[in-house]
């Protein structure tokens, strides 16, 4: 299994792996996004779900209460101290059968105590990415829409997998927006 370069990512993007695709890394006046040497910095859209405790809900992944969130559409969002938000990528991904991705947070946000978690994109997964954003600080933290949030690294297996995410009809296949926990 090897990490894939900018050349490979560009070739695959032209075949529809990433839409829309920014062929160059955009850095001027924004938190960077677009193609990098060995990855792709995705952008966060302007759709956010911020955790709130207004309804005194308990977070239960088997019985998730949507009232645990406040939905926000904005150019930026404030994540409360020691809190959490969900968002989605601007980019839509179609992962090849012999590829697995890993997502890592951007250092600009990490240095401010904002941690991004995204599970791997499995072979033949497709959709908009639901992004998990944690504010680990005791202060409110700002996240900017339409700018970079995390970097996707692409790894190609030595051979295609036997059973892909599409084959097993994964529950998060073809996500069209922010998708909450499912069983």
Swiss-Prot record:
Pathway: Pyrimidine metabolism; dUMP biosynthesis; dUMP from dCTP (dUTP route): step 1/2. Belongs to the dCTP deaminase family. GO terms for biological process: dUMP biosynthetic process; dUTP biosynthetic process; nucleobase-containing small molecule interconversion. This is dCTP deaminase. The lineage of its organism: Bacteria, Pseudomonadati, Acidobacteriota, Terriglobia, Terriglobales. InterPro entries: dCTP_deaminase, dUTPase-like_sf, dUTPase_trimeric. One of its GO terms (molecular function) is nucleotide binding. The keyword Hydrolase applies. Coiled coil: none annotated.
């Amino acid at each position: 299994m090897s990490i894939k370069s900018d050349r490979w990512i560009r070739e695959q993007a032209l075949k529809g792996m990433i839409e829309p695709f920014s062929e160059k890394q955009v850095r001027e006046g924004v938190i960077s996004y677009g193609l990098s040497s060995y990855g792709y910095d995705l952008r966060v859209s302007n759709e956010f779900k911020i955790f709130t405790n207004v309804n005194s809900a308990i977070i239960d992944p088997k019985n998730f209460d949507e009232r645990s969130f406040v939905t926000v559409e904005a150019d930026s969002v404030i994540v409360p101290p020691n809190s959490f938000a969900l968002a989605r990528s601007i980019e839509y991904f179609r992962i090849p059968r012999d590829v697995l991705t890993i997502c890592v947070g951007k250092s600009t946000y990490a240095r401010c105590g904002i941690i991004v978690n995204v599970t791997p994109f499995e072979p033949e997964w497709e959709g908009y990415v639901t992004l998990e954003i944690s504010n680990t600080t005791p202060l409110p933290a700002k996240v900017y829409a339409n700018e970079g949030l995390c970097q996707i690294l692409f790894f190609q297996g030595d051979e295609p997998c036997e059973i892909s995410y599409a084959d097993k009809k994964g529950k998060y296949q073809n996500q069209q927006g922010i998708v909450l926990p499912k069983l």
